[in-house]
Amino acid sequence: MVELKHVCAAFSEREVLHDLSLTFQRGEVTVLLGPNGCGKSTLLRTVLGFVDRTGGEILLDGCPIEDFSPRKMARQIAYLPQSRPVPNITARRMVLHGRFPYLGYPRRYRKEDHAAVTGAMEKADAADLANCALPQLSGGERQRVYLAMALAQSTEVILMDEPTTYLDVRHQLEVMDLARRLAGEGKAVVLVLHDLCLALRCADKVAVLHNGRLQAFGTPEAVYDSGVLQRVFDITVHRTRTEKGWRYYYD
């Protein structure tokens, strides 16, 4: 579990997150929503210590986040950023990087490392890309490889910043299904998404940010009922009940 208590953060002395308090629970998918530049990605990077925190505290399973070394942190939290470099290596070699927190130096991969990589690539629908060079892959294929690398870290918390970027509709839905399955395994899954309807459909909890401030945090139904989505996005959001639950759309 990751708990943020009255967290503030700043870039170059300019405060960008203001008094945020929310919790990412194990066994749940939490989606961060908000307009561009509202602080969603910054929130994830603040949890990881990449952005200076100027106030408040962040707890990982009840312990201050600053008590964790980078190596120990990488065994607890996996992070899929918006973009990554594209080295000239195979997809499987890239996914093996997810095992670095468990290796000494020089790095010698064990059977369990190779097994974790194989399982992660299968989960991310990237197994058929194993021997392909990353520069030769499409953006969507590379995204699946990067997702597999995050899964290969075998962490209990997974932070993903726009994981559906570059993916076609089928693979977007597969990523959301994977997020649900990971939560079902007891992991805390946190996603930054721009697809409002997909987020409301798949999330257990939704956090809405605007100008670095938390506007709402709760179930999709509670957030919808609050009217905050209309105010923040300046749209009209509708919902209809189907056999599979609520479906949302907007105009």
Functional labels for PLM-detected ranges:
Residues 108, 133-137, 141:
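Conserved ABC ATPase signature
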